Amino acid sequence: MKKALVVVDYQNDFVDGALGFLAAENIADKIYSLVGKAMADRSFIVFTKDTHYDNYLETREGKFLPVPHCIKGTPGHGLYGMLADFEEVVTPNAVILEKETFGSDRLCETIEEAFSGEPDVIEFCGVVTNICVISNVILCQAHFKNAEIVVHEDATAALGDMQHYAIEVLKGLGVKIV
């Protein structure tokens, strides 16, 4: 089975940094477990990294969310916890994809290139469910017409009720929630 795991923006600034929140910290073990299983199964893994620059506050997103975060070259930009090891070690079945917006078409291209076509399954975990996770799930769902799209609810996080609302929207779009 051709399978990909996408770990969305599980970075220091979203866990214990500029935009950190407890729910994001509480899913660390679930994410580590999913990554470990994907490595053991030789699945393709994409770690997306929200990536901004010194001019962040001048961008559309910066005006919407005026909190500098994930600035390239800062500790907050790095992958959180044990995932930071993937920034140091080259692994043939794992890539890091820097993205400057909530969702990235390059994610679809990266997955498609890895499989020379469409995978059977694309799984998602990470943060923030109602912003970057949902954006990338919808992009992949639109791009890959036959792949099963799966979101690990217990390995995603958002603030307050936004988690529930985002999961309900994804269910309504036919995404498999596990």
PLM regions: where:
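Short leucine-rich amphipathic alpha-helical surface patches
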Residues: Q141-F144, E153-T156
